[in-house]
C-alpha cells in the first residue's frame, strides 16, 4: 500500500464538539467523520482498524464452534411483541412503519429474530447445541449521543446466540464463549477485566461484562487485588461493615437541626461522624390499589444502588416518590425523614450496614428536627434487610480474600445466560430423546466492535496521538522516505524495503506523498502506526536507516541490509 493510493485526512485541531480523548484523536486522525448526531462515516483508516477487530473476533468465534449468519437490520414488530420488548423498551428502540403501515424495529439486538430461526429450524435434541453469530450494524436511539463512537446511535456489534437442550449445556456454552472472549481481548492487546454483572433488560440468570481498563471509563469496576473477585458496581455485593450490632448506649432524643437537610450538614452541626447518620430514600410502587410507599435506609456516607433496590421483593418496578406523596406519608418534606412515626404505614428496608447500627441519627419526620440515639428493637421494629448500597474502596471482598478496590472501565463485551426467557415466550422448543417437548436454553454474547476502537485509544495514547496495539493497528509499519520525490537513492531504498516487507506478509504502507519530514512523522504518530522506518539521504550514505517504535523515545540506526529482519523481529516481539 502506498499513501498516494490511500486516503489520509488528518487535522491539527479536534472539532469543538469532541469531548473525550478517543473522539478527539479519531477525528484528528481522519478515522471518522460525523454525519449526524451519533452517526459517523468510517473513513479508510478507521475501517482498516474495524476490519482487524472483526477478523480477530471472527477467527475466535469460529474456533469456538459458532456459526456465522446475517440477520436483517429491519425486523417485524410482531416478533418483538411476542417477547414483550416492543412495549418494554423505551425510545431507544427505533420504530418505523412501511408504506403498508406495518410496524418494524431497527435492531439494537437480535434475540427475537434468532429465536424465530431456531424455532423454525430446530426440531430435535440431535440438532443441539448450536451457536449462531453475526457481525452486523445496530441502532439505538440514544437520548444524548456523545463521546463519538463510544455512545453513538449506529454501531457495529458482534452478537452470538447459543441454543442448548438443558442447563448443563447452557453452562458449557456460556463458558465456551467466556473463554473465547478472553482470547479475543488478549489478542487485541488490551488490559481488560471480566466482571460479574446484572442482566438488565435482556433478562436471564448469569452475566459477565468485559471492560477495557481506562481512567476515563464511565463504569466503576470493583475488584479484589488479592483474589479473582471482580464485578461491576451494579452487581458488586456490599457486606455489612459491622459484624454485630452494639448494645444501645444513648437515649432517644429529638434534636433541633434548623435548615440541615443533608446528612453531612446534620453530622457537622451535631458534631458526630457522618458514619453515624442514616439517609432516608422514599420509593413508590404502583398497583390498581394505589401507590405503596417504601422507605429505604442507607448510611449517610453511602449511595443507593438502584439495581440492587429493584431486586428487593416488590420493588422491581419502583419509582421515586413525589414530594406530594412524601409529605402526605411522612408529614415532613424531604431532608428530615426517618423510620420513626410516619403519618401513614410504609414498608421499611434497611441496608445491611444500617441494620447493624446502634445509636444512629435519622430524620424525625418533622421539619428542622432529627433523632439521635436511635436503636433497632427499642425505638422501632427490626427492619427488613437487603444489600442496597454501592460498595466503596476498602470494603471486605465477598469471597473473604481481602478488601475491594475500584477502577474505571469501558464496557466492550457482555455475555448472558438467558435461560428460557425468549424460548418460552416465542415457543422455541425441541423434542428430547423421550419425545417430550422442551424449551431451548439460550445464551447471548455481544462485543461492541466499533466501541473497541474508542476503548483501545482511551487506554493507549500520548500527546502525539494514538498508540495502537499491534494486532488492531491500521498498518503495522510505515516507511517514511525523506525526499522520496526528489532523491532517487532514497526512493529506490524505500521502494525496496516496502516491497520486501510486503513479500514477507507485513501490513506496511509507504508514504510517497513527498511531505516534509515533520508533517509526515506527525501524521503517522497521530494515526498511531506501531513501527516506523525512516529512509534519508544522510543515513543511506552511512548504509543505515532509522527504526522507531511508536512508544520509543529515540530512533535506532539499523543497517540497510538488516532493516527488514529487524522490523520483522520487532513485530514478533
From Swiss-Prot:
Q: What is this protein called?
A: Proline--tRNA ligase
Lineage, opening ranks = Bacteria, Pseudomonadati, Pseudomonadota, Betaproteobacteria, Burkholderiales
Alphabetized UniProt keyword annotations: Aminoacyl-tRNA synthetase, ATP-binding, Cytoplasm, Ligase, Nucleotide-binding, Protein biosynthesis
The record, for InterPro entries, names:
aa-tRNA-synt_IIb, aa-tRNA-synth_II, aa-tRNA-synth_II/BPL/LPL, Anticodon-bd, Anticodon-bd_dom_sf, Pro-tRNA-ligase_IIa, Pro-tRNA-synth_IIa_bac-type, Pro-tRNA-Synthase_IIa_type1
Catalytic activity field: tRNA(Pro) + L-proline + ATP = L-prolyl-tRNA(Pro) + AMP + diphosphate
- Cellular compartments annotated: Cytoplasm
A Pfam family that the UniProt record links to this protein:
tRNA-synt_2b
Its EC number is: 6.1.1.15
